[in-house]
Amino acid sequence: MLTQRVCRILNANVTVRNLSIVQASSVSSEKRKDSEQPKLLSSIDDIGVNQASKPVFQVIGSPATVLNVSIPPSYPLYVSKGSIISLNSKDKHSVLDSLVSQTRLINPIKRTLFGLINFRYEKIFSTIPFNALVSSSVSTFSWGSSSKIVRQRSFVSLDLDGRLDWAVFPPKAVQAYAGDNLTITNPFLPKSLTKFPRVYTLISGRGLLSLTGEGQIYKITLGNETILIRKENLLAISVNGNSEIPQSLKNVNLNKELKEGSREQISSRPVLKYFSQAKDVITSSYRYLTGNNQYIKVHGPRTLLLSTNSQLESFHYKNGQGSENYFSLAKSIGFANPEPQPKDYLKVVTIEKGEIKGYESKNSFLEEQKQQAQ
């Protein structure tokens, strides 16, 4: 369940409805049979190459940090540049013999100038069916230091049938999509939602789409009601075109609304009133620069995707300076991550006849050599 810091429900009357908040791995606007619903896979066991005429997106693990994509022949797959882990095919010929890869830039100038950093995608298609494993990791260079921040992210897949569009807000959320029937545009956010010109991603049409968000991803089905969502946690919402955004979203400063009553109590004291006004000016200036404690009021009915905005980060230093002090400080205050074990990064993948049959963690590769020797 999400904490109150993530979302708050505004009840306009006495009637209270139990809000549905579930962890999301796949979201579809079509009703399917249970046997057709995409399932969350715990490992890469029994993943076969897709022989059907439609692509299949399946998330792997918990959290879902890997996406398995099955693509039929001559069907284009678009993935964020540098996120492909592996490619394989069941065909007797190598997937490299028929694979075509092209770089595609999506609105590079507009995205760079107005807040969407990720505009480089790789278009991949082949004359034979193939599988691709896609990573959710995104490396970000930290300005002013010699480090890179690698944030923990997870996948959610969307199946668009043309009836609903999706508005996606984080700058690096669109990780992969399949087909040429999806339209991706970058309209400007309404002035009521941002102080500076910024764009978001609007996806419409038919096809499969995979988003990534920090931490876990949850789905909220909103009825004819209103909900407050912390800005950093809002991943995407379902909409009917770009024109619906101004009526569906509104900026809310939660601290300002909660403290209105306390201001009335000190208004009769001139000295306290002066210090209160000075504090408000400083606080408002700080929030103007940092966007702290800003919420978005979302009006239903619609579907929302929220990310828990995990703060678990690992720092990779280029020259090692400062790393010793950082880890000693983290350990002393009790926030250090547990010591990594060999099985956390040693993996054995078994491939038979072009299919991935097994995926295991090992403490040592010597164990695998002994098993093969026997």
Swiss-Prot record:
Enumerate the InterPro entries for this protein: AIM24 (IPR002838), AIM24_sf (IPR036983)
Domain of life of the organism encoding this protein = Eukaryota
* Targeting signal (transit peptide) range: 1-18
**Chief location:** mitochondrion
**Gene Ontology cellular component?**
mitochondrial inner membrane
Q: Where in the cell is it found?
A: Mitochondrion
Q: Name one Pfam family in it.
A: AIM24
Q: Which GO terms describe its biological process?
A: inner mitochondrial membrane organization
Q: Which UniProt keywords apply?
A: Mitochondrion, Transit peptide
Q: Which PANTHER family match?
A: ALTERED INHERITANCE OF MITOCHONDRIA PROTEIN 24, MITOCHONDRIAL
Question: Family per UniProt?
Answer: Belongs to the AIM24 family.
Name the record gives this protein: Altered inheritance of mitochondria protein 24, mitochondrial
